Amino acid sequence: MSLLNPVLLPPKVKAYLSQGERFIKWDDETSIASPVILRVDPKGYYLYWTHQSKEMEFLDVTSIRDTRFGKFAKIPKSQKLREVFNMDFPDNHFLLKTFTVVSGPDMVGLTFHNFVSYKENVGKDWAEDVLALAKHPMTANASRSTFLDKILVKLKMQLSPEGKIPVKNFFQMFPADRKRVEAALSACHLAKGKNDAINPEDFPESVYKSFLMSLCPRPEIDEIFTSYHAKAKPYMTKEHLTKFINQKQRDPRLNSLLFPPARPEQVQALIDKYEPSGINVQRGQLSPEGMVWFLCGPENSVLAHDTLRIHQDMTQPLNHYFINSSHNTYLTAGQFSGPSSAEMYRQVLLSGCRCVELDCWKGKPPDEEPIITHGFTMTTDILFKEAVEAIAESAFKTSPYPVILSFENHVDSPRQQAKMAEYCRTMFGETLLTEPLENFPLKPGMPLPSPEDLRGKILIKNKKNQFSGPASPNKKPDGVSEGGFPSSVPVEEDTGWTAEDRTEVEEGEEEEEVEEEEEEESGNLDEEEIKKMQSDEGTAGLEVTAYEEMSSLVNYIQPTKFISFEFSAQKNRSYLVSSFTELKAYELLSKASMQFVDYNKRQMSRVYPKGTRMDSSNYMPQMFWNAGCQMVALNFQTMDLPMQQNMALFEFNGQSGYLLKHEFMRRQDKQFNPFSVDRIDVVVATTLSITVISGQFLSERSVRTYVEVELFGLPGDPKRRYRTKLSPTANSINPVWKEEPFIFEKILVPELASLRIAVMEEGGKFIGHRIIPINALHSGYHHLCLRSESNMPLTMPALFVFLEMKDYVPDTWADLTVALANPIKYFSAHDKKSVKLKEVTGSLPEKLFSGIPVASQSNGAPVSAGNGSTAPGTKAKEEATKEVAEPQTTSLEELRELKGVVKLQRRHEKELRELERRGARRWEELLQRGAAQLAELQDPAASCKLRPGKGSRKKRIVPCEETIVVPREVLEGPDPRVQDLKDRLEQELQQQGEEQYRSVLKRKEQHVTEQIAKMMELAREKQAAELKSFKETSETDTKEMKKKLEAKRLERIQAMTKVTTDKVAQERLKREINNSHIQEVVQAVKQMTETLERHQEKLEEKQTACLEQIQAMEKQFQEKALAEYEAKMKGLEAEVKESMRACFKACFPTEAEEKPERPCEASEESCPQEPLVNKTDTQESRL
């Protein structure tokens, strides 16, 4: 955690970008080329260009997906444009001057902005540096204050021809409520007419912040501020802010030595940064407005910034990582119809994906160029070489770590396969890994190389020919028809066995058995089952044999048909990869989850969507990540919830496309069951509490909104989804939700869990959301900037939330944890509670309901057969009549300590304090006004001053700071104006006091009613639970008694068989024992039932008495509050006169002589008078 020093700083804009450069912008569709000046604003928010007509166009840097220069940039197709740029001349240098910016809301809806510079190589620099700004992790994860600053920057750049900010731009920027925008502009003394304009000099950052505070007030932050600052003070001191940061904004699980708490000098730096008032900065004080901007700053980011960069160990074997993977990458729409595009390979790789899929099919004459398409569907084709070229360009723009090309090869032509291999070798060059690394040979038991070892490399996943002899070009593979298309008989898949295996007799025999079993299984399948299997797998089951050229490119990622987990463990080859449809993977996960996890510790697996997902929808990847599956492939063109989760999680670790699995999913000596509900070894479970407090600028319309909070993790994790109520009004600017926190009590593996927070309109329309891994969250108050469905940052919408994370502690150990944290405090409180309980109950029973023991012989000797008929039920009766501890009900003292009651009392105390503070302030205002009116009757130089006293929570009244010089005419005789002023002020003070005391009385009566109702509600809940527990215990004890009596019956029968061997005698004695047993059980049950009924009656009597006591308390406290009110009303007249005398004693010397008092001096001592303040008032609200 780095609260005071953010790990990642925002990107820096190079000087030449903000100064601008001349370009020609061209568009192929319109065939128009126009000169522009291209710039980036100094803060790096916008790329914008200005036409000769002074018209400006903006492009948000967060929407930029790629920049390209040279041969990878767009080339004009229009002949008119080609002539403009002299492209048909042989010595043309167009490729050295051009660059293209690609932007769009998702990977499919793209826009290409094409620019040509006047100088060579300028476009290259612009392309590289603009992409660096767009890809910087803090561009998309900026603080709330940064996103608000973006609005100001744009307003100041969109100027009218006169160089002013049009007011209509404000209405366009904040369209939800025009009246509120007008009111906020008026509050800042700015023009508000639609056709008006504002001078940029009149709208600096300070005015903009005031405008935002007027447009979007933050009462919820004011409440937080009030709870931590000095009472009745409009500021928070440095010490209070330090306490707030260390208590609320700091993760309580952190070690205080390794991560020391905030220090006052660090907090002073925060005050210097965020406090708008210079005077407060000098005094080390933070105002409520400063608090708002502090909570919007980067120091309070909801994310741990270090998780955004590469922070994980990248030297582990490749199969120890989750790998960002794509399915049918070339598709832009559905699986059955729609266009295919090589551009998708670029976009997917730019998003951080490290495994893309190429479905290769044989090209048609005359070119016979291999193509990529979805076989046997209506999707369009793209050339294989175009896809390879796109991959070569974009493979390592976002991440330097290895890219895996997953080939689904249906090209049955050796010549076309050779052409494919040649394209790969030529276009990928040295980045293509064709031979195993020296330290990681392809041998059983050897681990895979790490992402760091394979840095900058491209790996091919394709069938590998295991025979040393070259493939015959004239021989057609099995299962391929003359027309070149696969026949209905699927080609046998490679099992990943090497030529080395075939020299071993035992393994060879084993292979034959496996093949025979597969053939038998295939023969036993009926036609419908075969069709179903093919529909689930798509065309993956119809791959053809790999010929030598393609086979030679395969090394660490060799596909193999999955036989069984045992078979794979026996082979122990880490370079073998099996692919599963989501259905097959789910079946394996359901039947053998722990074996699946162990399999993924050793080698890699790939999961892909079932073939029936024609709409390109996705399955939830979480279940397969839980099993450790590395390549969980999804359809990147569909931005549904599974894809959103995938993109959100792989944004972390530097968007490298690799996330290190947890230790227990990597170590062979650890066992992990994804369906476990218990504690997992070496993992500390986490408890997460989230309170959704408010939202800001959620929608462009005035609508009611709600928030959904959802947890993704293991099946054994707690409740998955919560939802707030609808916002009270159709207010999308600053809605507030006053609800209890949502608690996820026991998150078993935080490293495998993530939190989704989504905002919806009343009708369910999506507004924005955010998905964040649990281990990347910070505790405290945070502004959560929302994202679109395609994970693009939204500038305006945000949520204000409170997060609290702590280590999970079971309820049974909660007291022990508290005791260990603060032993002295815990045992002191425990002793006090014990004393109170003893006073109420007289003793402290160890158990509320003790079990009813069944009597047994003291010496433990077996019962003889002759004892079976004597005194039936006597011992059972003795057992049933043994003394049972009477159950106790919850006492009044315990009810008062319940969380719900305590919380309500604290709220009431706060309300009373606020009421008293307002009354005291009104009293003081009346006295100050009277003093000011008196001053008007005197010389201006001799005015009476009032100042707040020190050392008090409330403001006290001090009569004067200086001796008042009274005019001669006032001393010689009473002035009627002064007397009228005195009478009027006395009457106002009397009315104010009566009104204040009535308000306090009414509020206290209301508080008493609410607290009594709360106690009654909790008491009834407790009592219902007590009765239920009592009945359950009674049933358990009865069953236990019957079991013991049954065991005694069997002991008697066994003892009897040892005494006599006569069958007739044995039957007779057995009947006697059984009859005696029945009588004993009946007597014991009857006696126990009577005892328990008596105890239940006593328990119900105690509960009724408790409820009556609670009801009686209401009347007592109402009477007490009324008595206090009457006493205060009686003393109000004297209190008013005393306040009047204290304030005007210097102005009325006659009164001062009648009641001598120490003269008023300009001292630091405060006046002893404290109007309307009763120090015990706040305590009296507690029952």
From Swiss-Prot:
One of its GO terms (molecular function) is phosphatidylinositol-4,5-bisphosphate phospholipase C activity. Expressed in the gustatory cells of the circumvallate papillae. Not detected in non-sensory lingual epithelium, brain, parotid gland, liver, uterus, lung, heart, adrenal gland, ovary, spleen, pancreas, intestine, thymus, kidney or muscle. Its cofactor is Ca(2+). Residues 550-666 form the PI-PLC Y-box domain. InterPro entries: C2_dom (IPR000008), C2_domain_sf (IPR035892), EF-hand-dom_pair (IPR011992), PI-PLC_fam (IPR001192), PLC-beta (IPR016280), PLC-beta2_cat (IPR028403), PLC-beta_C (IPR014815), PLC-beta_C_sf (IPR042531). Pfam families: C2, PH_14, PI-PLC-X, PI-PLC-Y, PLC-beta_C, PLCB1-4-like_EFh. Residues 857-869 have a biased composition (Polar residues). Residues 462-537, 857-888, 1150-1183 are annotated as: Disordered. Residues 312-463 form the PI-PLC X-box domain. Its EC number is 3.1.4.11. The modification Phosphoserine is found at S952. Residues 666-794 form the C2 domain. Ca(2+) binds at N328, E357, D359, E408. The active site is at H327, H374. It is an enzyme of class 3 (hydrolase). Binds 1 Ca(2+) ion per subunit. Residues 503-528 have a biased composition (Acidic residues). GO terms for cellular component: cytoplasm; G-protein beta/gamma-subunit complex; neuronal dense core vesicle. GO terms for biological process: detection of chemical stimulus involved in sensory perception of bitter taste; G protein-coupled receptor signaling pathway; lipid catabolic process; phosphatidylinositol metabolic process; phosphatidylinositol-mediated signaling; phospholipase C-activating G protein-coupled receptor signaling pathway; release of sequestered calcium ion into cytosol; sensory perception of bitter taste. The production of the second messenger molecules diacylglycerol (DAG) and inositol 1,4,5-trisphosphate (IP3) is mediated by activated phosphatidylinositol-specific phospholipase C enzymes. In neutrophils, participates in a phospholipase C-activating N-formyl peptide-activated GPCR (G protein-coupled receptor) signaling pathway by promoting RASGRP4 activation by DAG, to promote neutrophil functional responses. This protein may be involved in the transduction of bitter taste stimuli. The receptor-mediated activation of PLC-beta-2 is most effectively mediated by one G-protein alpha subunit, alpha-16. Interacts with RAC1. Forms a complex composed of at least WDR26, a G-beta:gamma unit, and PLCB2. This is 1-phosphatidylinositol 4,5-bisphosphate phosphodiesterase beta-2. The lineage of its organism: Eukaryota, Metazoa, Chordata, Craniata, Vertebrata.
